[in-house]
Amino acid sequence: NPCCDAATCKLKSGSQCGHGDCCEQCKFSKSGTECRASMSECDPAEHCTGQSSECPADVFHKNGQPCLDNYGYCYNGNCPIMYHQCYDLFGADVYEAEDSCFERNQKGNYYGYCRKENGNKIPCAPEDVKCGRLYSKDNSPGQNNPCKMLCSNEDEHKGRFLEQTGRGKVCSNRQ
């Protein structure tokens, strides 16, 4: 390391730092230099302070802050909305399904439920149907499935947390 004296394991005279995201040529990076890029609208970029070689802690916007033109709300640095979850699970040309698909979540069976309690599938209340199993519409050529779902015994593929489900309502804890 050109900033350190190998014999003493200390910084050389005139060096402020030897490593770090905010260390350039043995000096602290200028204040305002980006050291961690934004990962989403809810995760702002971090910038060097000019007083340290380390990038400040990764911080997110407060959970519940509106994002994506008020379509969703920030949650742990992301703006979770159903379109993104459909895309993540099924790929391009797949979108949130029609409301009628989500009504299946009132049945409390493998094909539709809100949550599990002691192994039992609990149906969604009518106002919570978009907080249960996720349904997507596949617009790919040759596909004709308006209510596509991931067939899995796992309980993770649910409507995303903190998405607006109408008139200021959001999903939280699958309700």
Swiss-Prot record:
Keywords: Calcium, Disulfide bond, Glycoprotein, Hemostasis impairing toxin, Hydrolase, Metal-binding, Metalloprotease, Protease, Secreted, Toxin, Zinc. It holds the Pfam family ADAM_CR. Its cofactor is Zn(2+). Monomer. The keyword Hydrolase applies. Its EC number is 3.4.24.-. InterPro entries: ADAM_Cys-rich (IPR006586), Disintegrin_CS (IPR018358), Disintegrin_dom (IPR001762), Disintegrin_dom_sf (IPR036436). A motif (D/ECD-tripeptide) lies at residues 41-43. It is found in: Secreted. GO terms for cellular component: extracellular region; plasma membrane. It is an enzyme of class 3 (hydrolase). GO terms for molecular function: metal ion binding; metallopeptidase activity; toxin activity. Gene3D superfamilies: Disintegrin domain. This is Zinc metalloproteinase-disintegrin-like catroriarin. The lineage of its organism: Eukaryota, Metazoa, Chordata, Craniata, Vertebrata. Glycosylated. Residues 1-63 form the Disintegrin domain.
